[in-house]
């Protein structure tokens, strides 16, 4: 761990460089083109649909 005490500034420079490169790459993302060409999501599967109406303990809404 003595090397960490001696070279902490190199690790800090590397982390700052990674952060700056990440920000630059995120700025290059064209979100409008992605939203226009977004793939369709499959329909939602409701895994509780067979229990939805059976033995409903909640009171019914009165009109």
UniProtKB/Swiss-Prot annotation:
One of its GO terms (cellular component) is plasma membrane. InterPro entries: UPF0370. The chain crosses the membrane at residues 3-23. It is a single-pass membrane protein. Residues 37-63 are annotated as: Disordered. Belongs to the UPF0370 family. HAMAP family: UPF0370 (MF_01566). This is UPF0370 protein PC1_1167. It comes from Pectobacterium carotovorum subsp. carotovorum (strain PC1).
């Amino acid at each position: 761990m003595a090397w960490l005490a001696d070279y902490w500034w190199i690790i800090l420079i590397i982390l700052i460089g990674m952060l700056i490169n990440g920000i630059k790459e995120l700025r290059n993302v064209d979100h409008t083109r992605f939203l226009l060409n977004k793939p369709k999501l499959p329909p939602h599967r409701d895994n509780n649909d067979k229990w939805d109406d059976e033995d409903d303990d909640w009171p019914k809404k009165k009109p």
